[in-house]
Swiss-Prot record:
It holds the Pfam family Adhesin_E. This is Putative uncharacterized protein YjhD. InterPro entries: Adhesin_E, Adhesin_E-like.
Length: 76
């Protein structure tokens, strides 16, 4: 999410063999993120507005990258 431009994107998809990130880590896709605008009146817009109000000092540091290799490998 970009709080200043009111745009969103998705950078990575991870697929598991079962629902809710359970089971085997099957595949990972890291598409090139394309920024798209979102409506401030949408549910996403309402949530993002709340999230954008969080002060940076209150955020936890970014977690390390996942070292696990997917069973089917990475695909793009």
């Amino acid at each position: 999410m970009n709080c200043e431009t009111k745009q969103r994107t998705q950078f990575e998809c991870i697929y598991f063999s079962q629902y809710w990130a359970k089971g085997d880590f099957i595949a990972k896709r890291a598409p090139i993120g394309q920024w798209e605008p979102y409506s401030e009146e949408s549910l996403l817009g309402i949530i993002v507005t709340s999230v954008c109000r969080i002060k940076v000092a209150m955020l936890k540091p970014e977690p390390p990258r996942d070292p696990h290799i997917p069973l089917m490998g990475d695909f793009n």
